Curated annotation (Swiss-Prot):
Subcellular location: Cytoplasm
Species name: Desulfovibrio desulfuricans (strain ATCC 27774 / DSM 6949 / MB)
InterPro entries reported for this sequence: Asp_de-COase-like_dom_sf (IPR009010), Asp_decarbox (IPR003190)
Cellular component GO terms held in the UniProt record: cytosol
EC number(s) per entry: 4.1.1.11
Catalytic activity as recorded in UniProt: L-aspartate + H(+) = beta-alanine + CO2
Identification of the protein by name: Aspartate 1-decarboxylase
GO biological process, any: alanine biosynthetic process
Length: 141
């Protein structure tokens, strides 16, 4: 089994840190829907400001809020305004399965509005692999 990227929220900003909570990260379900991130899904979080790396699970917050709230122990790893990368992974049988996947990557502005949706594309050819980043237009609002 090979663990590969399935979805990534790149540069989303922390909107709040709530220490007295059971744990997790609270995310806007509309943002999660665009990336394909599910409630209770295990995710890694990398803080671009501090370099801190943690893992937790996702809970959905209020739709349309653009929230990114670190809860419980995770709240100690970030401050409001920090840019983070949130990533979800999946297991595939082996390298031959990588080209059948195209992970979704969302990028954000300073107000957690989605700026672009990208896809990571891996192609197998001539006994090797190539990697490209492709635009994946957002649905009309």
């Amino acid at each position: 089994m090979l663990k590969i990227l399935r979805a990534k929220l790149h540069g989303i900003r922390v909107t709040e840190c709530v220490l007295d909570y059971h744990g997790s990260i609270t995310l806007d379900p509309e943002i999660c829907g665009l990336a394909g991130i599910m409630p209770l899904e295990f995710v890694y979080i990398w803080n671009k400001h501090s370099g801190q790396r943690i893992s937790t699970y996702v809970i959905y917050g209020e739709a349309g809020s653009r929230c990114c709230i670190l809860n419980g122990a995770a709240a100690r790893t970030c401050q409001k305004g920090d840019e983070v990368i949130i990533s979800a992974f999946e297991y595939v049988a082996g390298p031959g399965d990588i080209s059948q996947r195209s992970p979704v990557v969302l990028t954000f502005d300073a107000h957690n509005r989605v700026q672009e949706r990208l896809r990571y594309i891996v192609e197998q050819k001539d006994g090797g692999m190539s990697f490209n980043i492709a635009d994946d237009p957002l649905p009309e609002a």
